[in-house]
Amino acid sequence: MDKINAVITGVGGYVPDYVLTNDEISKMVDTTDEWIMGRIGIKERHILNEEGLGTSYMARKAAKQLMQRTKSRPDDIDLVIVATTTSDYRFPSTASILCERLGLKNAFAFDMQAVCSGFLYAMETGANFIRSGKYKKIIIVGADKMSSVIDYTDRATCPIFGDGAAAFMLEPTTEEVGIMDSVLRTDGKGLPFLHIKAGGSVCPPSYYSLDHHLHYIYQEGRTVFKYAVANMSDSCEAIIARNHLTKEEVDWVIPHQANQRIITAVAQRLEVPSEKVMVNIERYGNTSAGTLPLCIWDFEKKLKKGDNLIFTAFGAGFAWGAVYVKWGYDPKEDA
């Protein structure tokens, strides 16, 4: 019997209509467009500013487009995995809400929380469900409403993040394409350097936590930069070596869109030319679990069947890794 692997058969994406520019950010905090572009590489970010809408709204938009592009019916879907840090509620899962809003009757669903590395983890998890032979169509979504956890009086974090979502369809294949390998790692020593202190069981919501802005992202940028560059580079090197690829055989590197300086440093350490590195941070900012699939959403028409793609990310935890994908289809007319 031929070995079953999981192949990406389509992509869908969504970003909100409202665009928050650097000029607007500079009216909120002491910064400038020149500083943000020079230090972070972001020109604008999309924000979901309609009251009462959360991460599931963006996830539904992305998944709906994905289902249309792959001609998938609601009853075809077996599993939904949503990688997110900004779930609609503490419970139930955003994935369960998404199932209801897509009209999925035969699927089970769960959220995956690995912050900016969440989509990497979802890719490998979804692929293993496909490889089991029991599941035929799996939707994996990376979606975050980062504006809901940003302090817009904090100049260190508020220029960085945006809102967005994108989704992949995973299906079985016996061809030599698909999600080929992964290197995934976690090290809990990263907790002090990147976290949201309040809102969990250690520090439940209180007047104190609200007054002291403890429900927003805290980040020590220099430490995160150092660990991100080293670990993203190392995991890429490991997966390239393990799969006997040369640097020339790598067609695309898809790095988490955290900071342009991180992206550039990783590419330089890997000795990969800039034209092989997917970058869209200038338009979207850091959408956390959304960055990797949003890159594919933007660059899909440039991909060819058989292209070697290396996805890599780093996030709070610390959590990081790389996933090797051999792309499964040529450009589609409706993509």
From Swiss-Prot:
Residues 257-261 are annotated as: ACP-binding. It is an enzyme of class 2 (transferase). Keywords: Acyltransferase, Cytoplasm, Fatty acid biosynthesis, Fatty acid metabolism, Lipid biosynthesis, Lipid metabolism, Multifunctional enzyme, Transferase. Its EC number is 2.3.1.180. GO terms for molecular function: 3-oxoacyl-[acyl-carrier-protein] synthase activity; beta-ketoacyl-acyl-carrier-protein synthase III activity. Coiled coil: none annotated. GO terms for biological process: fatty acid biosynthetic process; secondary metabolite biosynthetic process. GO terms for cellular component: cytoplasm. Pfam families: ACP_syn_III (PF08545), ACP_syn_III_C (PF08541). Its main location: cytoplasm. The active site is at residues 116, 256, 286. Pathway: Lipid metabolism; fatty acid biosynthesis. It is found in: Cytoplasm. It catalyses: malonyl-[ACP] + acetyl-CoA + H(+) = 3-oxobutanoyl-[ACP] + CO2 + CoA. InterPro entries: ACP_syn_III_C, ACP_syn_III_N, FabH, Thiolase-like. Homodimer. Catalyzes the condensation reaction of fatty acid synthesis by the addition to an acyl acceptor of two carbons from malonyl-ACP. Catalyzes the first condensation reaction which initiates fatty acid synthesis and may therefore play a role in governing the total rate of fatty acid production. Possesses both acetoacetyl-ACP synthase and acetyl transacylase activities. Its substrate specificity determines the biosynthesis of branched-chain and/or straight-chain of fatty acids. The last Arg residue of the ACP-binding site is essential for the weak association between ACP/AcpP and FabH. Belongs to the thiolase-like superfamily. FabH family. This is Beta-ketoacyl-[acyl-carrier-protein] synthase III 1. It comes from Bacteroides thetaiotaomicron (strain ATCC 29148 / DSM 2079 / JCM 5827 / CCUG 10774 / NCTC 10582 / VPI-5482 / E50). The lineage of its organism: Bacteria, Pseudomonadati, Bacteroidota, Bacteroidia, Bacteroidales. The gene is fabH1.
